[in-house]
Every structure is written in structure tokens, then in C-alpha cells.
């Protein structure tokens, strides 16, 4: 990414990049928050791996660990959890029809999992998943992984 920038920006980006970390990775890898036991709550939740978290940042296990922290949820894996939902960056704007097909496939996998909630760590994916589920009148909720984790904290 930074190779496409003018040198004056490239140096700043390369200096900042190692200091940036996803909140899921921060909580699990740096602050060492982890589930004490596998949660087996009543509400089934599945996890969608966003492209930027899994491919660019290597974040995959950490969001699942945070979901498992909430005893109200039971994490169930969907097929192709790591497959793009069709909303990466400006892709949905430049390839709208293909984006819809990809989103529909992701929606089908969410429904097939039997989950009542689909979690992801990406706001763009949240919008795409919400749109695909709403188009089909599906009752599945879309939540950010940190929202599910926050629900488990004492109030």
C-alpha cells in the first residue's frame, strides 16, 4: 500500500503502521483477555471474517475468543466464514452487481449456520450483511464483535 504513495507520506505511514492494532487483537493478544471456558449460551452467533482483518492484519482467532467471553452466546461456524461478503473498500461501488452476488452467497451461509446473530469486526461488512439480510427479510441481527464482548462486561 505505502509503495503507491509519494515518499513524504510513505515514511510517515511506515512509521505509524507497526503502532496500529485492531481492537480485537489488542484485547486478546496485548491485554490477554481470553474466555475461561467455551460459552454455550442460548443465542447462536456466527462470525464473518472481514478481508482486511484476516488478510491484512492476520486477525481471525481473536474476535472468536471475544465472542466466547459472552455466556449468552453459542459460537457456531458458518461455511466460508473467511470468504469476502462483497463490500471491500470501493468494490461495492464499482462492481455493484457482483457485490450483490457475493453478498447473497454470504447471506446464504449465515442462514445455513442457524445463527440468530452474525458478528464481524468491520463496519463496511456490517452494512453489507445488514443489507443482504434485510433484502431477504431475515431476522438475523448483525453486531460488531466488540459489541458482543461489551455485553459480557459487568455493569
Predicted feature locations:
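Iron-sulfur cluster-binding electron-transfer modules in prokaryotic oxidoreductases
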Residues: 1-155
Amino acid at each position: 500500500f505505502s509503495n503507491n504513495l509519494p515518499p513524504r507520506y510513505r515514511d510517515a505511514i511506515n512509521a505509524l503502521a507497526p503502532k496500529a492494532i485492531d481492537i480485537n487483537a489488542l484485547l486478546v493478544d496485548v491485554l490477554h483477555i481470553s474466555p475461561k471456558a467455551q460459552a454455550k449460551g442460548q443465542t447462536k452467533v456466527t462470525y464473518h471474517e472481514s478481508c482486511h482483518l484476516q488478510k491484512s492484519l492476520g486477525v481471525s482467532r481473536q474476535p472468536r475468543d471475544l465472542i466466547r467471553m459472552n455466556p449468552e452466546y453459542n459460537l457456531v461456524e458458518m461455511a466460508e466464514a473467511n470468504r469476502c461478503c462483497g463490500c471491500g473498500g470501493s468494490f461495492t461501488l464499482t462492481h455493484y452487481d457482483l457485490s450483490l452476488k457475493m453478498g447473497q452467497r454470504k447471506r446464504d451461509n449465515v442462514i445455513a449456520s442457524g445463527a440468530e446473530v452474525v458478528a464481524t469486526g468491520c463496519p463496511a461488512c456490517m452494512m453489507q450483511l445488514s443489507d443482504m439480510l434485510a433484502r431477504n427479510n431475515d431476522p438475523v441481527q448483525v453486531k460488531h464483535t466488540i459489541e458482543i464482548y461489551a455485553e459480557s462486561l459487568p455493569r
